[in-house]
A protein has these predicted regions:
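Low-complexity, interaction-prone regions
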Residues: 1-82, 89, 150-151
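Long, highly charged low-complexity segments enriched in Glu/Asp and Lys/Arg with interspersed Ser/Thr
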Residues: 120-151
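Charged, amphipathic alpha-helical linker/scaffold segments
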Residues: 61-119
Length: 151
């Protein structure tokens, strides 16, 4: 994950790198850049053909990052549903998309936050070994986390 070009802090950084590669006609590395950042081939190809001024917008940059991080996630939590929810929210709020793209924001961190809240709820219910949290409660935790952490 982000092995060749690293984790970009913004869509602007990602697009600047893509612009440099395109100007150098280094399509091989442009493909690597897109793959590392979860950018679909179709979007990359449109950019390569100079049909778009930028490789990606903030929403696609965020969704791409989430998809890349999802492939790495192995802790057993229902990460796919969380990525779907966050992706939908990125379409609704560009500030969230920009926040997701930040280097210091990760899917792993979101999942850890949900796990901490679940563990807290287990402690509150004496004798409970686990707690079931409906999707809407998990999404409410994500919304609360987003409000506190975006920036």
């Amino acid at each position: 994950m982000f092995d060749v070009f690293g984790n970009f802090d913004s869509v602007e950084e990602l697009n600047a790198c893509a612009k440099g590669l395109l100007e150098e006609q280094d399509l091989e590395h442009l493909k690597v850049l897109a793959e590392e950042n979860g950018i679909p081939d179709g979007i990359r190809e449109v950019y390569e053909q100079h049909l778009s001024e930028e490789l990606v917008d903030s929403v696609n940059a965020a969704i791409g990052k989430l998809q890349v991080e999802l492939k790495e996630e192995t802790d057993g939590m229902p990460a796919g549903e969380i990525v779907s929810y966050l992706s939908m929210r990125c379409f609704e709020k560009e500030i969230l998309a920009r926040g997701v793209r930040r280097k210091n924001r990760t899917l792993k961190e979101c999942l850890q936050n949900i796990r901490k809240e679940a563990e807290k709820r287990v402690k509150e219910r004496r004798g409970a070994q686990m707690v079931a949290m409906p999707d809407l409660e998990v999404f409410a935790i994500l919304r609360m986390y987003q409000v506190c952490q975006i920036g």
